[in-house]
Amino acid sequence: AAQLFQKACDGGEALGCNGLGILYENGRGVRQDYQKAAQLYQKVCDGGGVSGCTGLGFLYSDNKRVGQDYQKAAQLFQKACDGGEALGCNSLGILYKYGQGVRQNFSTAKEYYGKACDLGLQLGCDNYRELNEKGY
C-alpha cells in the first residue's frame, strides 16, 4: 500500500499523500515517522485537502508526536471544519470544551459539536447532547 500511496502522492494526488501520512503516523508497512506524516498532512492541507488538516491537527494536539501546540491544532481543525470535515469540527469542539489553545467556551464547543453532528459524525451528536444536558 505504501508504494501505491507514494506513487499517487508523487503524481499530485492528495488522497495518496494523506494515505501515506496515515501509514507513517501508524507505522503500517513503513517505519513509524511522525515528522514524515506531518509533512505529508501539511502538503494535503495546503492543497485544500481538509482531511490532511485534521490529521496534522491530531499530531499537534498529541504531545507524543510532533510537539504539542494546541493553538496550531485549533487553527488546523478550524480549517478542516470550515471545509466540511466533521472530525475537524468535533476536535475543535473538544479544544473549546477544555480550553486547549483557545479560550474555554462551552457554548462554542457545543456549536462545533453540532456542526460535526450535522455533518454525520455520531460522536459530535453525543458530545452535543452531553453539553446540552448540562445546560450549555
Residue spans of the language-model regions?
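Low-complexity/repetitive intrinsically disordered segments
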Residues: 1-16
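Short coil/turn and helix-start
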Residues: 10, 28-32, 46, 64-68, ...
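Periodic short-repeat tracts
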Residues: 10-13, 38, 74, 78, ...
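Hydrophobic face of amphipathic alpha-helices that form TPR/SEL1-like repeat modules
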Residues: 19-26, 53-62, 91-98, 127-134
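TPR/TPR-like (Sel1-like) alpha-helical repeat modules
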Residues: 104-122, 129
